[in-house]
Amino acid sequence: MSGATKFIKCVTVGDGAVGKTCMLICYTSNKFPTDYIPTVFDNFSANVSVDGNIVNLGLWDTAGQEDYSRLRPLSYRGADIFVLAFSLISRASYENVLKKWMPELRRFAPNVPIVLVGTKLDLRDHRSYLADHPAASAITTAQGEELRKQIGAAAYIECSSKTQQNIKAVFDTAIKVVLQPPRRRGETTMARKKTRRSTGCSLKNLMCGSACVV
């Protein structure tokens, strides 16, 4: 990248209690908050290096509760990328991606790309937790990938704030999606229509194992 450092505004959205704030705190401080405090993350801005590119990454946290529905879209102005999160142990948060969040994002920011993120990966296969929480419903990787296709997200990543698995990958991926020129994104879409070979994907370098699907 040449010239001035590019500023990227990244806004996290999703149902309340899916772990958006925890994800941001873990990414910026490498610490996992032990107590749940709704949306206490201050807006964050710092220079980040990804694949040799230095960008100034701005992170915006939003509250998912209905009480904030009128105020929340104010954070969307100027967004370059959305990190749309749902919990891998909450069927309701998964379903709300289509029912609630996509209509809202497409109304207020129709052309902004999305990275879909499944949070609380460490609990999906945690048998004792699932046994103690009958209302919990595990979402599979295949279901997450299907949702990614439905909403047209640029990538799908599963992560855990508690173990910090793939936390950095979430935001590295968001940065890479923004840095990829729009023309190239269009070419990627056309390539996928013409061939099913994975080698035609210009986002191939975003792959980060089985928990990250592009």
UniProtKB/Swiss-Prot annotation:
One of its GO terms (cellular component) is cytoskeleton. The keyword Nucleotide-binding applies. Belongs to the small GTPase superfamily. Rho family. It is a peripheral membrane protein. Inactive GDP-bound Rho GTPases reside in the cytosol, are found in a complex with Rho GDP-dissociation inhibitors (Rho GDIs), and are released from the GDI protein in order to translocate to membranes upon activation. Gene3D superfamilies: P-loop containing nucleotide triphosphate hydrolases. The lineage of its organism: Eukaryota, Viridiplantae, Streptophyta, Embryophyta, Tracheophyta. The gene is RAC2. One of its GO terms (biological process) is regulation of cell shape. This is Rac-like GTP-binding protein 2.
